């Protein structure tokens, strides 16, 4: 078995802390962010309950490239999105997973290293 070292680009290194702070590379955030194609956007919604299918539709329809997967990091505890959101994302051929933010950050790095097109919505 051949083992090779895999270097993670600093720009795609994700870290999460329990103090309500997200760290992406050298930048820190204390609000909901959307990580999309290497760019971070701050999202005005403050709770997961405020997300609805129209928000995802508007982001997807204005994007140059749609992801294979959207990772939802729901903060310290795992929460789930409304089933209507799952139906909309499925109609676009996009998978999604909800998990706590620390797990979402680790999963995002792994999927990126596999070359998968992945977006993330992360609550600190």
Residues covered by each model-derived region:
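Non-catalytic interface/targeting segments
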Residues: 1-54, 58, 113-124
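Short active-site-adjacent helix-start/loop capping segments
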Residues: 42-43, 78-81, 107
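CheY-like receiver
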Residues: 59-62, 107
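Beta-hairpin (beta-strand-turn-beta-strand) motif
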Residues: 74-77, 101-102, 123-124
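A short glycine-rich beta-strand->turn/loop micro-motif centered on a GG-aromatic cluster
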Residues: 95-105
């Amino acid at each position: 078995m051949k083992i090779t070292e895999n270097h993670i680009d600093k720009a795609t290194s994700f870290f999460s802390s329990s103090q309500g702070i997200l760290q992406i590379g050298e930048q820190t955030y204390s609000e909901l962010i959307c990580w999309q194609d290497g760019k971070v956007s701050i999202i005005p919604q403050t709770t997961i309950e405020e997300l609805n299918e129209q928000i995802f539709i508007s982001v997807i329809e204005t994007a140059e490239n749609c992801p294979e997967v959207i990772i939802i990091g729901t903060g310290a505890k795992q929460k789930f999105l409304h089933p209507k959101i799952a139906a909309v994302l499925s109609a676009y051929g996009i998978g999604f997973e909800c998990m706590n933010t620390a797990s979402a950050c680790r999963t995002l790095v792994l999927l990126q290293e596999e070359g998968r097109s992945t977006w993330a919505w992360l609550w600190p």
